[in-house]
């Protein structure tokens, strides 16, 4: 990919997702008209944030960089409160803007802060992990975690633009790319089987940030999400398909107190959802089996603690897709044919979980992808 690619998210307030390399000039131009810009970044990205701040300052913009905690630790009400305090101190107004620089947790938190500050100010996302590029940064979902569950406090607040600089993937740990691949694979199963074909043809190339396959996977994933979000911004119907594998995945994250990466938890959730679809008579064996095989190819987990089912059931009871006290799952009726399964018999859930259950982990053990 030599020239930047623009994917338009055609909602009521349309915005571009720009995919390419060396996008600093395009990024800075996005803030024309703002007097003040707050750059919220995770700790490892201080140097990049400073480069953006300096470029904005050269244009006469009063830019500030503010460090936020890494990963899920940042998606906390206390951190949001800190961010609001900073915005107050620097005098950020509705004609100004906020920028996120980091992974999915950074986009979730920063989007939430932007949605709530003065009831909504412009936010521009610069995702730096694969997961954030193909999922969190696109679509306008924002949120923080509470004891009640993951992302239960949040808002829909669309960004003004998203800039995906592929060069940033060359600096992140390999396991970050592996974790993000869960969302890419999910997209392949619900909407674009070519994604699965590309990964299966050369798993190593699919994980190589300097090659040509990964940018293609990112573009395809973003295009799918853009179409779904344009049709159903507020997740009243179609957008639920993007939560394929997430019902169990979120419950795993909560049980692990967010020490598991999101992608690792979703990977297990995908295998569970496939088994659920198979047992419900909705999904053919070949497509169900393909879930585990392709996730194994890229090094993602496909099993979880066999003693955890009771805890996970409690976690799934808080899922946002549930209605009238009934669990609701996204399942497949075939490749790229997502549907819903409402109120499945508990015995079906037990049977599906048995397919992913493994021996309980050693005391104090955990899995960090």
Curated annotation (Swiss-Prot):
One of its GO terms (molecular function) is metal ion binding. This is 3-dehydroquinate synthase. Its cofactor is Co(2+); Zn(2+); NAD(+). Pathway: Metabolic intermediate biosynthesis; chorismate biosynthesis; chorismate from D-erythrose 4-phosphate and phosphoenolpyruvate: step 2/7. The keyword Iron does not apply. Its main location: cytoplasm. Zn(2+) binds at residues 183, 246, 262. It comes from Rhodococcus erythropolis (strain PR4 / NBRC 100887).
């Amino acid at each position: 990919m030599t020239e930047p690619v623009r994917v338009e998210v055609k909602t009521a307030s349309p915005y571009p997702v720009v995919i390419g390399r060396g996008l600093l000039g395009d990024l800075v131009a996005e803030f024309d008209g703002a007097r003040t810009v707050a750059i919220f970044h995770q700790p490892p990205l201080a140097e990049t944030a400073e480069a953006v701040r300096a470029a904005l300052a050269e244009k006469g913009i009063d830019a500030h960089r503010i460090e936020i905690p890494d990963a899920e630790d940042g998606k906390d009400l206390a951190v949001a409160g800190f961010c609001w305090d900073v915005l107050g101190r620097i005098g950020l107004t509705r004609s100004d803007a906020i920028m996120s620089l980091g992974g999915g947790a950074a986009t979730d938190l920063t989007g939430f802060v932007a949605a709530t500050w003065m009831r909504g100010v412009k936010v521009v996302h610069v995702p730096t992990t694969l997961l954030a590029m193909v999922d969190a940064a696109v679509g306008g979902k924002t949120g923080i975690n509470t004891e009640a569950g993951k992302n239960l406090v949040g808002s829909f607040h669309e960004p003004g633009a998203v800039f995906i600089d592929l060069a940033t993937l060359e600096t992140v740990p390999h396991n970050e790319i592996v974790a993000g691949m869960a969302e890419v694979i999910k997209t392949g199963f619900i909407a674009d089987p070519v994604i699965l074909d590309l990964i299966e043809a050369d798993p190593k190339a699919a994980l190589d940030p300097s090659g040509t396959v990964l940018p293609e996977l990112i573009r395809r994933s973003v295009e799918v999400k853009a179409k779904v979000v344009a049709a159903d911004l507020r997740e009243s119907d179609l957008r639920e398909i993007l939560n394929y594998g997430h019902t169990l995945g979120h419950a795993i994250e909560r049980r692990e107190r967010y020490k598991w990466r999101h992608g690792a938890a979703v990977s297990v959730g995908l295998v569970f959802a496939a088994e659920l679809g198979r047992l419900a008579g909705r999904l053919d064996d070949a497509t169900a089996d393909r879930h585990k095989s392709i996730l194994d190819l890229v090094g993602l987990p496909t099993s979880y603690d066999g003693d955890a089912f009771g805890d996970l059931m409690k976690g799934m009871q808080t899922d946002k897709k549930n209605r009238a006290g009934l669990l609701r799952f996204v399942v497949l009726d075939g490749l790229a044919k997502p549907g819903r399964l409402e109120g499945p018999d508990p015995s079906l859930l037990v049977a599906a979980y048995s397919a992913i259950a493994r021996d309980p982990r050693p005391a104090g053990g955990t899995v960090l992808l």
